[in-house]
UniProtKB/Swiss-Prot annotation:
UniProt main location, coarse: cytoplasm
Superkingdom to which the source organism belongs: Eukaryota
UniProt GO MF annotations: tRNA 2'-O-methyltransferase activity; zinc ion binding
Organism: Debaryomyces hansenii (strain ATCC 36239 / CBS 767 / BCRC 21394 / JCM 1990 / NBRC 0083 / IGC 2968) (Yeast)
Catalysed reaction equations from the record: cytidine(4) in tRNA(Pro) + S-adenosyl-L-methionine = 2'-O-methylcytidine(4) in tRNA(Pro) + S-adenosyl-L-homocysteine + H(+); cytidine(4) in tRNA(Gly)(GCC) + S-adenosyl-L-methionine = 2'-O-methylcytidine(4) in tRNA(Gly)(GCC) + S-adenosyl-L-homocysteine + H(+); adenosine(4) in tRNA(His) + S-adenosyl-L-methionine = 2'-O-methyladenosine(4) in tRNA(His) + S-adenosyl-L-homocysteine + H(+)
Region span, Disordered: 1-29
Protein role: tRNA methylase which 2'-O-methylates cytidine(4) in tRNA(Pro) and tRNA(Gly)(GCC), and adenosine(4) in tRNA(His).
Subcellular location: Cytoplasm; Nucleus, Nucleolus
This protein's name: tRNA:m(4)X modification enzyme TRM13
PANTHER family linked to this entry: TRNA:M(4)X MODIFICATION ENZYME TRM13 HOMOLOG (PTHR12998:SF0)
Chain sites annotated for binding Zn(2+): C78, H84, H94, C98
GO biological process: tRNA nucleoside ribose methylation
Keyword Zinc: yes
Family: Belongs to the methyltransferase TRM13 family.
Length: 457
């Protein structure tokens, strides 16, 4: 970077922090740095891979496996997780330390495939299947014929759906975060979700928050900061078991667990806090055993962008626990920002959800698979120069704009099936389920939130 830039920055007023100066310097340096882009061409996306490569190689580490160079050695997929690759000469050592290596000693709350089914027949009395499901009725139809059959059904459904309401909120606990980041879209989403939690009585020092699909736990950290922001000394009287549980099957760096504890200790009013994390798939999680040593007073389930079938598995994990049994008052509520309905699994939907879809005309696995394809139209991008009114020779024969509108209807249908199912199951327990847009679509296309709250709130 030119010396004059550094001199200009150094001469700026003292109120500009060192961090701000460093960010400005980095911004200039990034412009000058040549990006060594991977040369692998992704035919499906009609573009090159965006990942960085080493200066002496043509491809990034993930695509070296597709184009091995004899003088460099062979790159092979990891047998434990083929989403990453490794040099063949290092494979033996890699398998000993790979993060995808199965655990030898599972935690006591691990029960393989526990939540792929319901432990008790909760649905027997709550809803009767009308018997109209037919898994084989569409087996003879090709993709184009499936579109021709189900697009008119979705168009008819569209006319019967009232628009979702907006519930855009915010919480002052994220004011510092919003001032720190230049790209505010995640902070805006977090602020609205937490503001909605407060509005619905889900934000309190007497809650234990269980974050599913937590990643590094960023949502929980800002929930904690917001709880601390609202905290009064009188709120601590008789309160206990405040804390956070983290559930994620992935390996996450820069986890927020310790920062949450630090924030609580450094708060004006010091708070005792419990955190607990498990690297586990939701389908294998025994919620009661995970919570046993904590024994929380009230449990609130939260998640930001819980992907596809993970939302349905979360519902099942709660239904398989004591939290949603009639004699328990530990369940405090739930707030989930949903995403990726195109990767939902038909066999993981609650039986009531499947029955709802069947009542709307989607009675087979093939029909659900075509519904998922249509769902993806709601969030797929438009290439530069694409005319919204052009079909672009799409197999459906629809324009981009028509596909986007139908994609939103398909997404809404799956979401409504979840609301229908959970209302049947939680209404008798004194809860109700609601759904709303929590931010504008310009912030995120995945802007739908599902919330379960006590009727008394």
């Amino acid at each position: 970077m030119a010396n004059i830039d550094k001199e200009v920055l150094a001469s700026q007023p003292d109120e500009i922090s060192k961090d701000q100066k460093r960010r400005k310097l980095n911004k200039h340096e990034k412009k000058e740095r040549t990006h060594l882009q991977c040369e692998y061409f992704i035919a499906k996306k009609n573009r090159r891979c965006c990942m960085q490569r080493k200066a002496d190689r043509k491809y990034c580490s993930e695509h070296l496996v597709d184009n091995n160079e004899p003088d460099k050695g062979e790159r092979v997929p990891c047998p434990l997780d083929n989403n990453h690759s490794v040099w063949s000469k290092n494979l033996t050592n890699h398998l000993k330390k790979c993060n995808a290596k199965p655990k030898e000693n599972e935690e006591i709350w691990y029960e393989k495939d526990l939540n792929t089914k319901l432990g008790v027949d909760i649905t027997e009395d709550s809803f009767k299947n009308d018997g109209n499901d037919n898994d084989n009725e569409d087996d003879d139809l090709n993709e184009k014929e499936l579109y021709e059959k189900y697009i008119p059904i979705l168009r008819n459904i569209k006319d019967h759906f009232e628009p979702l309401g907006f519930s855009i909120s915010k919480h002052s606990g994220l004011k510092n975060r919003l001032s720190e980041v230049s790209n505010q879209k995640h902070a805006i989403q977090q602020s609205s979700l937490i503001g909605n939690m407060k509005k619905r009585g889900l934000l309190d020092i007497n809650k234990f928050y269980l974050e599913f699909g937590c990643g590094k736990g960023e949502l929980s950290r800002f929930v904690n900061l917001s709880v601390l922001e609202d905290l009064q000394v009188k709120d601590l009287a008789g309160k206990s078991k405040y804390g956070y549980g983290f559930i994620d099957r992935g390996v996450n760096r820069m986890k927020m667990d310790s920062k949450i504890v630090k924030d609580a200790k450094e708060n004006t009013i010091e708070v005792n806090i419990t955190t607990k994390r498990s690297k586990i798939d939701i389908k294998d999680l025994h919620v009661d055993k995970f919570l046993k040593d904590i024994d929380p007073e009230h449990v609130v389930v939260i998640s930001k962008h819980l992907c596809g079938a993970a939302t349905d598995l979360t519902f099942k994990s709660l239904l398989n626990s004591s939290l949603l049994q009639g004699n328990s008052d530990k369940f405090g509520g739930l707030l989930i920002a949903m995403c990726c309905r195109h990767v939902c699994a038909y066999d993981q939907l609650l039986p009531e959800s499947r029955a709802f879809l069947q009542s709307k005309g989607f009675r087979s696995l093939s029909s659900f698979n075509i519904l998922k394809k249509i769902v993806s139209w709601a969030v797929c991008g438009k290439r530069d120069g694409t005319n919204e009114e052009s079909t672009g020779e799409h197999i459906s024969g629809l324009t981009f704009k028509e596909r986007e509108e139908l994609g939103l209807v398909a997404r809404r249908l799956i979401d409504e099936s979840r609301v229908f199912a959970m209302n049947l199951l939680v209404n008798p327990l004194g809860f109700h389920t609601e759904m709303f847009w929590y931010v504008e679509k310009e912030i995120t296309l995945e802007n739908v939130c599902l919330c379960i709250i006590p009727d008394s709130n």
